[in-house]
Amino acid sequence: MRARPALVALLLLGGGLPVAGADDAQLARGLQAIQRMTGCFLVDYSYVEVQALKPGYVRDPRVYDVNRDKSAKEWIVAETISPRRIRLQRVLFLADLAGALRPGTEVRHQSEDWEYDAPFLYDFVAPLHWQPRDLRPTPGLWTRRVTNLDDGLRYQCAARWSEDTAYPDWACPSNYAPIPGRETRDMGRSDYQALDRSTRIVVYGASQGGSWLERQDNVKTIHGDGGRVPLVRELGKNWYVRLPDSECAGGRAFAERRRAFWTLLRETWDGLLDGSGPFVERTPPGQPPRFAKMFDLEDSVLGRDLSDEATRQETRRRILDLIQQYRAP
């Protein structure tokens, strides 16, 4: 799926969008770059610790390499929510090194919301705690919101897409965030609670295959009652190497079957995360993570007609009830 100039032009002209010189150029630059991030990709995640920052800490010599014994692929599809907001929904699945799909590995991965001139974002300020921040004093920014697997909050940052480089890039120098799932799930880490991320995304053109890169220069951070303690610096790269769309047929089918539920889920979260106050989560004792229960809820409504108003409202109520169960009073 290549960038679509006609769609970009439509977004610029539609919805009564104001056009004003530099503002228009930044909007167009971002829209074109974000559309190039869609399609079928081989995804290569690689992370390594490079510098201990806390006295007495011994650097972990292991390299996180997602493709060591398999191939991770993602189908990334765009949903245009408004002329200034695009959602990139990712479906992650695995194949063996010979290229054969591992059945049942398809999973709804993170969503990425990109919004131009967003009025606010939610800063991660402590484990399970996010605080809204007003962005209106600084216009002309693209806000990137990376969600949990169930569209809940993870981390957000606002910056401009470059306008003077051969390939568009978007850089966020400091973005406090929860500990990544790759660390707790795959690396068995529980000795720190947060990651201070420095991210740079570079989107390459068609002559480079239409691939893109996310560079990360992060600080693993202990977050305790005494504040933040830097533990160790890590470097990482997420390469998205474009593949023919046919290699993501399974991920595409997985997404199509669930699109109606995902849209309703996103709309429900939009109603809650309106910037009016903090959002604080909790995990009820003895319960699995919220996303696991949301996956179960999703499976229970597959095949139901969510365009039917009664079914839609019932499903929305179930989503809200589940979110509230994991929300601190």
Q: Which residues make up each language-model segment?
A:
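Positively charged n-region of N-terminal signal peptides that target proteins for export
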Residues: 1-4
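Bacterial N-terminal signal peptides
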Residues: 6-16
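Amphipathic/hydrophobic helical signal segments and adjacent flexible N-terminal regions
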Residues: 22-38, 46-67, 83-94, 125-138, ...
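N-terminal intrinsically disordered, cationic/polar leader segments
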Residues: 55, 73, 81-116, 121-123
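Short, solvent-exposed coil/turn segments at beta-strand boundaries
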Residues: 80-84, 138, 205-212
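Short helix-loop boundary/capping segments
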Residues: 139-203
